[in-house]
């Protein structure tokens, strides 16, 4: 029996507060919570309720011995806040751009449902603390999961960001899903030229309906960083699992390193720019960050989308490289093993790619450390084949950078020169011991 039919027979509607008695291994277990809408991808035979602690559980219909309504759902029209507050002259003004993701979610407490369509306006209204930091101009660009983000979205975000910065805003906060936030941060780092004010990407590992949500604190800290002196593209997220402080990471050196921890984001081969406390304290951890200044920000949005990111693995077939070349790809970023190696039998296909005008770049799947193709014979053969070693760049950053580079040149010598030029802090001069696993 499907859940819709089951609930209808029992006279139960989504949003009702119910008590369920379930039989598990001969024992009765009791749950109370709000009936949720059926999940789109569920089998349709499970009743989902939101417990009082905020978490959802699913109970198979066949295991439900008894289900009773404790309180009927209260019909209530949905409210959309516009966050139209009188500007305060003593506060700076920033723009919050909404793009989607976990931070852009809200709970309807009458039905228990969690909606991903939490607009930037509603998000701002839900965290009133940010109005004590700055005047907020919220704007929803789109509402998509970050895994659906494409280069065209990066370009739109870049233009909207530059527009906001050039129209009197002191900074921009971008609400973004966490899964591909590093890619977007890197793309903005290369596309936003002459950056004179802060651009801060922020997200949440846990949605706003969960007791352990990091959404509010992350947004508060991001807003504080957006009115700071650091004129860089940054990612601001929790610095540790508790609600102690957030960290501001440089946009080209940051990576999501855990699927679910609140402090999942880490600076790789670099130290963060700053620690931020929600009460307003900011501790800069380095002094070489780009400082706030005057001048117009402009967007360099030329991107070559026919670029691939390929991870090397034992037994990898050279046919994969050949396929990309045959399909007209202009660039390939390889995540090599160790210092930047591939199986030896890939080298002829890599050389063919370079000979046919494809830019082939090498990063390391170790993430930490630096590519060095001069140490072992395989690396030297790759160099001879024309592979560009990408120093200590993250694979994702190198992928985005190569798209940007090939948007400007088809000449492999010029492409190599540009890939090895440090435009946005993506390359550090040398590897510091204190940047490993921080």
From Swiss-Prot:
Output the superkingdom of the source species: Archaea
Q: Does the keyword Disulfide bond apply?
A: no
Biological process terms in GO annotation: amino acid metabolic process; regulation of translational fidelity; translation
Q: Which SMART domains match?
A: Asparaginase
- Can you tell me where the transmembrane regions are? none
Q: What is its EC number?
A: 6.3.5.-
Do the record's keywords include Ligase?
yes
The chain positions of domain Asparaginase/glutaminase read 92-422
Q: Which reaction does it catalyse?
A: L-glutamyl-tRNA(Gln) + L-glutamine + ATP + H2O = L-glutaminyl-tRNA(Gln) + L-glutamate + ADP + phosphate + H(+)
Which catalytic residues are annotated? 102, 178, 179, 256
Swiss-Prot/TrEMBL keywords: ATP-binding, Ligase, Nucleotide-binding, Protein biosynthesis
A Pfam entry, by short name: Asparaginase_C
State the CDD domains in the record: GatD
**Its job:** Allows the formation of correctly charged Gln-tRNA(Gln) through the transamidation of misacylated Glu-tRNA(Gln) in organisms which lack glutaminyl-tRNA synthetase. The reaction takes place in the presence of glutamine and ATP through an activated gamma-phospho-Glu-tRNA(Gln). The GatDE system is specific for glutamate and does not act on aspartate.
The family classification in the record reads: Belongs to the asparaginase 1 family. GatD subfamily.
Task: Give the record's subunit note.
Answer: Heterodimer of GatD and GatE.
Q: Per its record, how is this protein called by name? A: Glutamyl-tRNA(Gln) amidotransferase subunit D
- Organism of derivation: Pyrococcus furiosus (strain ATCC 43587 / DSM 3638 / JCM 8422 / Vc1)
Q: What is the lineage of its organism?
A: Archaea, Methanobacteriati, Methanobacteriota, Thermococci, Thermococcales
